[in-house]
Amino acid sequence: MAADIINGMEIRESILEELRGEVANLKRDYNVVPGLVTILVGNHPASLSYVTLKIKTAIELGFHEIQDNQSETITEEELIGIIKKYNEDPLIHGILVQLPLPSHINEGKVLHAIDPNKDVDGFHPMNLGRLVIGGNAITFLPCTPAGIQELLIRSSVETLGAEVVVIGRSNIVGRPISIMLTQKGVGGDATVTLVHTKSKNIVRHCQQADIVIAAVGVPNFVKAEWIKPGATVIDVGVNRIGFNEDTGKPILSGDVDFVNVSQVAGKITPVPGGVGPMTIAMLMRNTVRSAFFHLSL
């Protein structure tokens, strides 16, 4: 029996509808419009595509949106200077620097330069530290892990007491979602095993899991025989495996062998249309929350 498809586009739309109401309340009650700046260095096609989607969504929600495109030759010092300018701009509540950056720029230094209270991507060390502490300490959740957790919650996937395997230990997805799923509350209280390329017995771990989250960056890495019947499978991978000359678009594959795994799993996310749309929705939610937060500063 084929798995139920977790439709990230539909869940994204319901979240954006909720945010439209919050944006309207901000405007009506406080005359405040959420402000988001997206900083793009160079013209990397994938980065340009991602930024365009983010800008489009922000405009649809009624944000004050600034697109700041910079040449690939910009220096690290100049880029940090631009960030500091937006740190001090009261009309800007969220600062997004699109990664990757050119090799001559230290990404860590750039991300550290963002005001933690405007770090709507949730990558600043201070916000990652708040995530570890949990509870009321949390300011902004990293967008992709937050999107994964929201998919689980809104798809009625029980995490309380669940055995979860996260494949991948990146600071962007694997580590944060592992922490979030072990915290107390809705979408948490799980028992999490984090595995990676150096782990032994990855297959055995996955076969015991109620939920498998694949964020390893290898096309079709997770096989059907790895999955316990009825388990939930979340595919974070977006891998370009070819190019469709008829449509002019890249051919994408996730980290999961979708065709075969979907015959075993109970629920599964597709690629595209699963986790990806949720990442942008969580960025928008963080920006709205930042606008509310700045009312008290």
Curated annotation (Swiss-Prot):
Keyword flag Transport: no
GO biological process: L-histidine biosynthetic process; methionine biosynthetic process; purine nucleotide biosynthetic process; tetrahydrofolate interconversion
Catalyzed chemical reaction(s): (6R)-5,10-methylene-5,6,7,8-tetrahydrofolate + NADP(+) = (6R)-5,10-methenyltetrahydrofolate + NADPH; (6R)-5,10-methenyltetrahydrofolate + H2O = (6R)-10-formyltetrahydrofolate + H(+)
InterPro entries: Aminoacid_DH-like_N_sf, NAD(P)-bd_dom_sf, THF_DH/CycHdrlase, THF_DH/CycHdrlase_cat_dom, THF_DH/CycHdrlase_CS, THF_DH/CycHdrlase_NAD-bd_dom
SUPFAM superfamilies (alphabetical): Aminoacid dehydrogenase-like, N-terminal domain, NAD(P)-binding Rossmann-fold domains
Entry keywords, A to Z: Amino-acid biosynthesis, Histidine biosynthesis, Hydrolase, Methionine biosynthesis, Multifunctional enzyme, NADP, One-carbon metabolism, Oxidoreductase, Purine biosynthesis
Pathway(s) this gene product operates in, as recorded in its UniProt entry: One-carbon metabolism; tetrahydrofolate interconversion
Enzyme Commission designation: 1.5.1.5, 3.5.4.9
UniProt keyword Cytoplasm, yes or no: no
One Pfam family it belongs to: THF_DHG_CYH_C
Binding of NADP(+), residues: G168, R169, S170, T197, V238
Residue runs in coiled coils: none
PROSITE patterns according to UniProt: THF_DHG_CYH_1 (PS00766), THF_DHG_CYH_2 (PS00767)
One Gene Ontology CC term in the entry: cytosol
GO molecular function annotation: methenyltetrahydrofolate cyclohydrolase activity; methylenetetrahydrofolate dehydrogenase (NADP+) activity
Gene3D superfamilies referenced in this protein's UniProt entry, alphabetically: Leucine Dehydrogenase, chain A, domain 1, NAD(P)-binding Rossmann-like Domain
Quaternary structure and interacting proteins, as annotated: Homodimer.
PANTHER family assigned: C-1-TETRAHYDROFOLATE SYNTHASE, CYTOPLASMIC, C-1-TETRAHYDROFOLATE SYNTHASE, CYTOPLASMIC-RELATED
Role description: Catalyzes the oxidation of 5,10-methylenetetrahydrofolate to 5,10-methenyltetrahydrofolate and then the hydrolysis of 5,10-methenyltetrahydrofolate to 10-formyltetrahydrofolate.
Family statement drawn from the similarity comment of this UniProt entry: Belongs to the tetrahydrofolate dehydrogenase/cyclohydrolase family.
HAMAP family for the chain: THF_DHG_CYH
Protein's recorded name: Bifunctional protein FolD
The species this protein was found in: Lawsonia intracellularis (strain PHE/MN1-00)
